[in-house]
Amino acid sequence: MPTILVSALEASSNVHLEELRRNLPKDYRFIGVFEGKEALYSPREFSIMGFRDVIGRLGFLLKAHKEMVQLAKQADMVLLMDSSSFNIPLAKKIKKQDPHKKIMYYILPQVWAWKKWRAKSLEKYCDFLGAILPFEVGYYQKKAQYVGHPLLDEIKYYKKDIKGETLVFMPGSRKSEIAKIFPLFVKVAQILEQNEGFKRRVLVVPSFFKGLDLKALYGEDIKLFEISYDAHKSLFEAEFAFICSGTATLEAALIGTPFVLAYRAKTMDFLIARMFVNLHYIGLANIFYNALNNETPGLGESQLHPELIQHFLSVEGLLKAYEEMDRERYFKESLRLREYLASGSARKIANGMAFLLNLT
């Protein structure tokens, strides 16, 4: 029975991990950080945003890091997913502890956007790099393989036309995101009802919020919305979506649902990030759409969907995006993006894990 040390700190990584486990033999045992009863820590304990937040949780992060390195001694191999600030140093320490321990990195850091030197670190400490974007492989010498984007394995609903019955609102999965974005979405929903009459308003809530007091998280205005824990189905049924930056924006693009990206960070965090990351776009769909059109990812001229970031984010801007978006063009181009990203990611990663285990 192979034992796999997993480090999956993000909510989206755990969705991908769930699909991966469906493609693995039932006797694989998982330990580490992931959504599951047998985990050392839940990903929710790592749900922090911003530089100040990291400093405040530094003691916990160092403790978790040390425990994961020790836990690696029990594992036959290591699977790291996303979260490069935690996982690259983890890979380094595990390799130092046991140079023969096989390490796979799935959902690679965005070295094409910033910190390109991380590519060398990954190749030094990891044995298999699963790239989910076609253009990522070019940033590595030999260990990266394109495996397809995992969302195309996970999404079961794809629009055949742009029709929809509801308005979907997705203000993020972190409390800080919800606090900044949800009040704007509430005002948008109220104004649209005044202008266009009643439409079903669906608030998509992360599945890991089940059982929590949603009114405490979202406030009294949550009563204006229907609650859904199924993002894919809700997006499929929607006429339009208002979405906080993140994986959900790419999900909407692949499903074919028109949307506008909304994002606002703490001012200091935003300014610091701008010092390191120089991109025109932050939305994954726009970044990948640039690559599809043979432009530098995140720096191209082409745009699939509107983005309203920081001080550009307003109720008026969101309403304008809803009213003026060319839905026919968007739908046509979203189909091109879907074809570009391919599928079969989970199966290929499962095969890669089996290969590494055979080498141990």
From Swiss-Prot:
GO terms for cellular component: membrane. SUPFAM superfamilies: UDP-Glycosyltransferase/glycogen phosphorylase. It catalyses: a lipid X + a UDP-2-N,3-O-bis[(3R)-3-hydroxyacyl]-alpha-D-glucosamine = a lipid A disaccharide + UDP + H(+). One of its GO terms (molecular function) is lipid-A-disaccharide synthase activity. Keywords: Glycosyltransferase, Lipid A biosynthesis, Lipid biosynthesis, Lipid metabolism, Transferase. Pfam families: LpxB. Its EC number is 2.4.1.182. GO terms for biological process: lipid A biosynthetic process. Pathway: Bacterial outer membrane biogenesis; LPS lipid A biosynthesis. NCBIfam families: lpxB. Condensation of UDP-2,3-diacylglucosamine and 2,3-diacylglucosamine-1-phosphate to form lipid A disaccharide, a precursor of lipid A, a phosphorylated glycolipid that anchors the lipopolysaccharide to the outer membrane of the cell. PANTHER family: LIPID-A-DISACCHARIDE SYNTHASE, LIPID-A-DISACCHARIDE SYNTHASE, MITOCHONDRIAL-RELATED. Belongs to the LpxB family. This is Lipid-A-disaccharide synthase. It comes from Helicobacter pylori (strain Shi470). The gene is lpxB.
